[in-house]
Amino acid sequence: MSPDILLFISDQHAPQYQAGGQMPVDTPNLAALREQGTAFDAAYTPCPLCVPARMAMLSGLSPHHTGIFTNNDTLPQTTPTFLHAMATAGYETVLVGRMHFIGPDQRHGFTRRVAPDFTNSGWVRPQKTLEQDFGVHTQTMGYKWCIDVVGGGASPVVCYDDMVLDALEQYLAQPHSKPQLIVVGTYGPHFPYVAPPELFLKYLKTAQLPATWQGNEPWLNAQQRNLQEPNTRAEIVLACQAAYKGLVEHTDGLIGRARAAFDVFTQNRGTPALFGYLSDHGDTVGEHGIYGKKSFFEKSVRIPMVFAGSGVWALVPHKGHSTCQSAGPWPHRV
């Protein structure tokens, strides 16, 4: 019997930020997933940027083969993805939420989309539309303004991610005849660095400055310095750290919701279940004076990757003995 599969893909989650990680965060659902499955602790993104990483993951091709190096590039409609293969094998391939497709093809092998994306699907978006959608957070979606608004409060990221999980739960409450391959895409814990107030205050109490937060290392090259936010006050760095941890904990809660709904769904169907979690890239969160991705520092390029369920060994951590990446052969062996 074909297993039902759910892949939960977050955006910009550095795996150092989790329970037991270098930067501890309360992530009980991710910890349970790791205990019950196989975690790849040396997993890396093929490119520390959203669209190149995601298209590499779907196609199994590195960015230098896809030709996708920026968030404005488009995966050709003629490029097959593992979703095409799964649909051919009889699966209903469902996208719930984010994937950051650019261009007219908003499927690339998905036979169904249940919730919209967070970001634009084209190359131009009117400024007034952005301001209407994101309000005071409009500029914080970009690298050079991502720390202009930080702290605890209402966030379009949190609102969007909650909507995605609502849509997933509604979809899983319905009967489906075909085997299911469901990809859940959230935008968190991507900046803006604004978390639910209670989570922000929780982590602000213990927030610490990264050792390299001032970014004055003499060996940084011109590209790395171009990514820096110079002269950032210490309290802003601490607020970014606290908000990012709060966003990670919020994402962990969504992982728990997704897994609980998926377990009920597969139990009702009497089918084997496979659940996976990963992110497209990480976030330096102020280390070396850099926020977000686009650098090859460890917190930017390492990603969480863990699978549990049918056919997956439990309690098997792969810690640093060999590396893997999200553009490797794993999607094509699902």
Where are these regions (language model features)?
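Formylglycine-dependent sulfatase
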Residues: 1-334
